[in-house]
């Protein structure tokens, strides 16, 4: 399949009325906010989007995005590659009242003063939300072993004497 660059903005209502589908990419240079959240963006962001009008006459955008990124393991500090995949379902709104009236299945996405949505920002937001909160290797690939991870009580050598024990002995006198 030929890699086609996706538009940055478009009118979702007109696109939904035409029932258009898009398949294409955003390059790693375009997804600057994703790049700030990870060590590196290793592949193009592959997206597919489908626009339609539902039974309630709402414009609907269904789609998915996937990208390979490098994250830093929070256990051992070493980089590792991670495949991010996300799906989304949006309906364009102009106001908070319209957003409140949307069915639960749809997420609201605000249109600008020209009636367009920022597709790149929407895809970036969804990828950032799909990133792990605490990125870690799988246990078998991480250099930090289970024995190195201490949970619960600290070992005896790590416990220090109470500095206020002297005051407690003076109080007894």
Swiss-Prot record:
The keyword Glycoprotein does not apply. It comes from Escherichia coli (strain K12). Disruption phenotype: Accumulates reduced levels of 23S rRNA, no significant difference in 16S or 5S rRNA levels, nor in rpmF transcripts (ribosomal protein L32, next gene in its operon). No visible growth defects on rich medium at 37 or 25 degrees Celsius. The lineage of its organism: Bacteria, Pseudomonadati, Pseudomonadota, Gammaproteobacteria, Enterobacterales. Induction: Part of the yceD-rpmF operon. Keywords: Ribosome biogenesis. Belongs to the DUF177 domain family. Pfam families: YceD. The keyword Iron-sulfur does not apply. InterPro entries: YceD, YceD_bac. Plays a role in synthesis, processing and/or stability of 23S rRNA. GO terms for biological process: ribosome biogenesis. This is Large ribosomal RNA subunit accumulation protein YceD. GO terms for cellular component: cytosol. The gene is yceD.
